[in-house]
């Protein structure tokens, strides 16, 4: 994998701590239910005690120095420890007429003799702060050193601050996250026993401020006890991400991140669970596999599988396997998607994560391509990773942020895959991103394709990712510059020719509006001189161009900056100053800065004021820094007061579009009405096929020669052939004509009535009455005694076959193979079988059907069949017994 690969820039906000309210709501949301009674009662208790906890935190904050000083005096000797305490910078409070205590009616439980002074020190000597560790020894300040003293006092202040935070939050999670594991860190610089003593001293000092309120004192003691226990606890081990594959990154998640994140409840199907607990486990499996509780949302369930897993007939692992193979899952998560996207969703549902690498995608893509959904499900469920994480009893869960360490190479895609809208995205994300690692950088913004505007007349339209999301992460580094197309002569681009920045584009670029040198507001600059080229004789035309350039449209009368317009017309300000005032106006601020995030606003302003897209991260980061430290107006001044603006536009020119992205140019060229005939036309050399070249005439031919050649080959007799087709038995004339045509085709002559015997009379009557069709009539003529006498008995079998194909198929035999086939039928089964094979064959049915009398077909393929058919028809029937088909001239003389 490329070391410069980008896994996307999806924004994630890790949870820094937990509160009971957030945890309860998160658990209810994960289980798709409302808050239970016990949870509501606990929330009620927390909210009711909120005022008291705020007052406790306020009291401890106001007396923090005294509390820390008392604890420091307990463990340090030989000086004043409090002088080493560095207080955090505090904002100056706003001046108000009355204090907040008098307005809110709050009561502060601080007492004048609570913790400081001489009596407070004596009280601390005789009061019990808890058991003192046996290894505790006071620390001399001079030997400890100023640096260590500052760190020690800072740690004491932090401990007190964490306690107040936890009291306000209503839960000890802040203390757990920030204190557990500090024991090993502090023991390198300070004694653990001394730290325990000072925490106990702060506990006693804080409790002394609430002697009048038992409930408040109990809360303070409770949280300090938690602080002590968490500090004494050993440092927990990091959570290591498991994975049997070599291409999966071995990552670790600190335990503090795991403790701070929202807990994801794990469900396991145990034999001893109650019916309600088993139902909860089954619903959790539905929520994981189908991303919703299908029994609650759609009143659907797979009852026979539920019964089996409840009774212990199948394990939860097998239950997950069968759910993923069910028709419901196939319909929702497999059939609507291509294989690569279905694979990504299957990873989410079964393993609780997205694909990790390209190699993993390739492996499972081959499985789903060869075996379909069942093979993919079996491969995932039977994997070693599934066994390590979930085993046989645990329901799969999402292993997202805070549950385990996340990989950077699929960061953005995995965060999107965990969202509820993942099934609505049809485009595969993982394989698309992995494939882009080895490809050139795309034509998009360095901070995401969602920042690329459509470069149309009314400005930049940034697409939202709510419908048909198209964001594509790309590994743009700080040295990458985008390729921009110059609107003007190519030799004048500012990258290859920096000295030509101030050159006007002419007819190849946008129209330039420049204040004429004779008008009051014109000033002579670097690229102006005394030339009046592109000069405007009317300041109103220039003002309209400035509005359109800066705002993208004409403004209403009430939105125009009339004062600035008058000053420009009077020559008090330059065009550059006029553009700056437009960009600093309230309308520009509301349109293009306030509604958008910084990256989008900077890109928009850059295209409006400097009239080109940004090059890369270096340029964007400079504007980011200015925007964060100085704000909107400083960004405007940085653009308009830049050297590039001065070189390109000077003091008297309205900014005009100088550069485009390739994508923007393509969108403009593809619009209806903007496509030119000489652009986008691909000129390909016409390649003449070989058979056409061979058929072309190489010399000039005269008309007599052409007439002579046109008479060769198949002559006009083919077009003059009369086809007899019997469509109705009621037309006796047509029946009679068809009968006579059949006689001429089969017997090669007309048969007079006195020759026709009773056999033919019966056939003609049946044909006239509709009892038989023309095909059966032809077959009856061929099997008659007259045909046998005239065309079978006097000739050898090969000659009989030639005449049979002539009479019944209208052609000569195709080749020796056909003669051999019919010869075998004729020799073994006789004339009737031979006639039946031809008349009932597929060739006869396709050519003549059941109602057409056979006729000469003038076949031209194969090439040798036409002359054979011609010779067969032109020769008299009983002229000789010479065969037609064996008349081919041999290529090699036999016996020569």
From Swiss-Prot:
Keywords: Antenna complex, Bile pigment, Chromophore, Electron transport, Lyase, Membrane, Photosynthesis, Phycobilisome, Repeat, Thylakoid, Transport
GO CC terms, sorted: phycobilisome; plasma membrane-derived thylakoid membrane
Alphabetized Gene3D superfamilies for the sequence: Phycobilisome linker domain, Phycocyanins
EC number: 4.-.-.-
Post-translational modification summary for this protein: Contains one covalently linked bilin chromophore. This protein autochromophorylates.
Single GO term (MF): lyase activity
PROSITE patterns: PBS_LINKER (PS51445)
UniProt main location, coarse: membrane
InterPro entries: Globin-like_sf, PBS_linker_dom, PBS_linker_sf, Phycobilisome_asu/bsu, Phycobilisome_asu/bsu_sf
Enzyme type, top EC level: lyase
Residues binding (2R,3E)-phycocyanobilin, per UniProt: 190
PANTHER family recorded: PHYCOBILIPROTEIN APCE, PHYCOBILISOME 32.1 KDA LINKER POLYPEPTIDE, PHYCOCYANIN-ASSOCIATED, ROD 2-RELATED
Record family assignment: Belongs to the phycobilisome linker protein family.
UniProt-recorded name of the protein: Phycobiliprotein ApcE
Originating species: Synechocystis sp. (strain PCC 6714) (Aphanocapsa sp. (strain PCC 6714))
Lineage: Bacteria, Bacillati, Cyanobacteriota, Cyanophyceae, Synechococcales
């Amino acid at each position: 994998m490329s070391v410069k690969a980008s896994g996307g820039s999806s924004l994630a906000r890790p949870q820094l701590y937990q509160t009971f309210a957030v945890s309860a709501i998160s658990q209810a949301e994960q289980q798709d239910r409302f808050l239970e009674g016990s949870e509501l009662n606990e929330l009620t208790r927390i909210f009711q005690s909120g005022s008291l906890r705020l007052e406790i935190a306020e009291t401890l904050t106001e007396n923090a120095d005294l509390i820390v000083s008392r604890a420091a005096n307990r463990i340090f000797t030989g000086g004043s420890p409090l002088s080493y305490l560095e207080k955090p910078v505090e904002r100056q409070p706003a001046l108000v007429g009355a204090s907040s205590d008098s307005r809110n009616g709050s009561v502060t439980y601080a007492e004048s003799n609570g913790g400081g002074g001489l009596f407070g020190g004596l009280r601390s000597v005789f009061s019990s702060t808890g058991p003192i560790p046996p290894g505790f020894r006071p620390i001399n300040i001079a030997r400890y050193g100023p640096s260590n003293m500052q760190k020690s006092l800072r740690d004491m202040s932090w401990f007190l601050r964490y306690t107040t935070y936890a009291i306000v939050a209503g839960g000890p999670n802040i203390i757990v996250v920030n204190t557990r594991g500090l024991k090993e860190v502090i023991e390198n610089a300070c004694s653990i026993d001394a730290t325990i003593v000072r925490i106990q001293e702060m506990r006693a000092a804080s409790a002394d401020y609430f002697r009048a309120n038992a409930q408040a004192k109990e809360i303070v003691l409770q949280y300090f006890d938690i602080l002590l226990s968490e500090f004494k606890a050993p440092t927990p081990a990091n959570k290591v991400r498991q994975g049997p594959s070599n291409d999966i990154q071995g990552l670790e998640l600190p335990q503090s991140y795991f403790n701070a994140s929202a807990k994801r409840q794990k469900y396991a199907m145990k034999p001893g669970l109650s019916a309600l607990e088993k139902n909860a486990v089954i619903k959790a499996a539905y929520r994981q596999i189908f991303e919703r509780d299908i029994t609650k949302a759609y009143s659907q369930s797979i009852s026979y599988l539920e019964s089996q897993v409840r009774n212990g007939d199948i394990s939860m692992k097998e239950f997950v396997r069968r759910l993923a193979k069910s028709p419901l899952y196939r319909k929702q998560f497999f059939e609507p998607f291509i294989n690569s996207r279905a694979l990504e969703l299957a990873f989410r549902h079964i393993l609780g994560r997205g694909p990790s690498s390209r190699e993993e995608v390739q492996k499972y893509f081959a499985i789903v391509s060869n075996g379909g959904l069942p093979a993919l499900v079996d491969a995932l469920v039977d994997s070693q990773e599934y066994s390590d994480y979930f085993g046989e009893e645990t329901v799969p869960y999402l292993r997202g942020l805070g549950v385990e360490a996340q990989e950077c190479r699929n960061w953005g895609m995995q965060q999107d895959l965990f969202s509820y809208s993942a099934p609505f995205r049809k485009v595969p994300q993982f394989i698309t991103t992995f494939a882009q690692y080895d490809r050139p950088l795309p034509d998009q913004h360095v901070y995401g394709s969602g920042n690329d505007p459509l470069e149309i007349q009314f400005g930049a339209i940034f697409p939202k990712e709510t419908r048909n999301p198209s964001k594509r992460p790309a590994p743009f580094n700080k040295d990458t510059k985008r390729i921009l197309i110059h609107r003007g002569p190519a030799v004048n681009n500012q990258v290859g020719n920096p000295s030509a920045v101030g050159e006007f584009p002419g007819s190849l670029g946008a129209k330039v509006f420049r204040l004429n040198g004779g008008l009051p507001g014109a000033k002579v600059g670097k690229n102006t001189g005394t030339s009046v080229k592109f000069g405007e004789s009317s300041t109103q035309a220039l003002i309209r161009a400035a509005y359109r350039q800066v705002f993208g449209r004409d403004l209403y009368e009430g939105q125009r900056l009339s004062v600035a317009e008058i000053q420009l017309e009077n020559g008090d300000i330059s065009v550059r100053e006029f553009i700056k005032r437009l960009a600093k106006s309230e309308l520009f601020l509301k349109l293009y800065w306030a509604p958008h995030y910084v990256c989008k606003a900077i890109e928009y302003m850059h295209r409006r004021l400097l009239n080109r897209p940004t090059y890369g991260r270096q340029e964007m980061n400079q504007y980011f820094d200015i925007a964060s430290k100085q704000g909107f107006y400083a960004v405007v001044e940085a653009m308009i007061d830049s050297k590039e603006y001065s070189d390109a536009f000077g003091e008297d020119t309205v900014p005009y579009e100088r550069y485009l992205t390739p994508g923007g140019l393509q969108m403009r060229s593809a619009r209806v009405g903007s496509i030119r005939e000489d652009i986008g036309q691909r000129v390909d050399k016409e390649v003449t096929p070989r058979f056409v070249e061979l058929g072309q005439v190489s010399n000039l031919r005269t008309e007599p020669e052409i007439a002579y050649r046109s008479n060769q080959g198949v002559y006009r007799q083919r077009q003059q052939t009369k086809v007899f087709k019997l469509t109705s038995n009621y037309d006796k004339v047509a029946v009679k004509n068809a009968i006579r045509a059949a006689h001429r085709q089969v017997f090669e002559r007309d048969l007079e009535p006195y020759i026709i015997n009773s056999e033919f009379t019966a056939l003609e009557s049946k044909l006239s009455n509709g009892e038989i069709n023309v095909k059966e009539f032809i077959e009856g003529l061929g099997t008659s005694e007259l045909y046998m006498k005239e065309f079978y008995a006097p000739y050898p079998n090969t000659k009989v076959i030639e005449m049979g194909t002539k009479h019944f198929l209208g052609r000569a035999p195709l080749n020796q193979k056909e003669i051999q086939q019919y010869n075998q039928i004729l020799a073994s089964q006789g004339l009737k079988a031979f006639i039946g094979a031809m008349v009932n064959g597929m060739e006869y049915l396709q050519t003549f059907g059941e109602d057409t009398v056979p006729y000469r077909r003038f076949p031209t393929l194969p090439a040798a069949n036409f002359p054979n058919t011609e010779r067969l028809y032109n020769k008299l029937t009983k002229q000789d017994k010479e065969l037609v088909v064996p008349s081919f001239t041999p290529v090699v003389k036999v016996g020569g």
